[in-house]
Amino acid sequence: MEALVYTFLLVGTLGIIFFSIFFREPPRIIK
């Protein structure tokens, strides 16, 4: 169970970093 929690936290932090970088730059992919 601990491994599942650690993987969830890792994916969560990576997701937050990805979205912060994505929203910081202009959304060129959407347009």
From Swiss-Prot:
Annotated signal peptide: none
Plastid listed as a keyword: yes
SUPFAM superfamilies for this protein: Photosystem II reaction center protein T, PsbT
Entry-linked Pfam families: PsbT
UniProt key word Transmembrane: yes
Keywords attached to this entry: Chloroplast, Membrane, Photosynthesis, Photosystem II, Plastid, Thylakoid, Transmembrane, Transmembrane helix
Membrane topology: Single-pass membrane protein
Membrane-spanning residues: 3-23
InterPro entries for this protein: PSII_PsbT, PSII_PsbT_sf
Cellular component GO terms held in the UniProt record: chloroplast thylakoid membrane; photosystem II reaction center
GO biological process: one example: photosynthesis
Subcellular location: Plastid, Chloroplast thylakoid membrane
Entry-linked PANTHER family: PHOTOSYSTEM II REACTION CENTER PROTEIN T (PTHR36411:SF2), PTHR36411
Subunit structure: PSII is composed of 1 copy each of membrane proteins PsbA, PsbB, PsbC, PsbD, PsbE, PsbF, PsbH, PsbI, PsbJ, PsbK, PsbL, PsbM, PsbT, PsbY, PsbZ, Psb30/Ycf12, at least 3 peripheral proteins of the oxygen-evolving complex and a large number of cofactors. It forms dimeric complexes.
Stated family: Belongs to the PsbT family.
Role: Found at the monomer-monomer interface of the photosystem II (PS II) dimer, plays a role in assembly and dimerization of PSII. PSII is a light-driven water plastoquinone oxidoreductase, using light energy to abstract electrons from H(2)O, generating a proton gradient subsequently used for ATP formation.
Name the UniProt record assigns to this protein: Photosystem II reaction center protein T
Gene: psbT
